[in-house]
Amino acid sequence: LWSDIDMIIPVPLHWTRQWKRGYNQAEVIARAAAEALGVPVRTDILMRKRRTKTQIKLDIKEKAQNVAGAFAVTEDARAIFRNGGTVRHIVLLDDVFTTGSTLGACFRALRSVFPPTVRISVVTLGYVER
């Protein structure tokens, strides 16, 4: 899992939620992991393009619907390939895993730009059984 990592991408918050909270907990965790591993954190690759409801009280189907299409890759992600860059391994990081809806939506957005030859690993700090 930890070999050949090119970047760690934290699951982004919508800018209004991050502004209100003052930080993104996934980014805080990602920065600590990145420092330990000596790899960059890229907050410029994946964006939350619309606000979503908090997922805490939603059931599995509602969670999937809530985040469907909420994430997109940025122009910076597309530029990596246009400029001849190579990426072998991305770590997508979130603070907690419950149903996988958020991470799945992020994965699909990343896969729309990064080909199957790029490994995308998912890491979370915690798991909540529902």
Predicted segment positions?
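Conserved PRPP/pyrophosphate-binding segment of the phosphoribosyltransferase/PRPP-pathway fold
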Residues: 1-91, 99-130
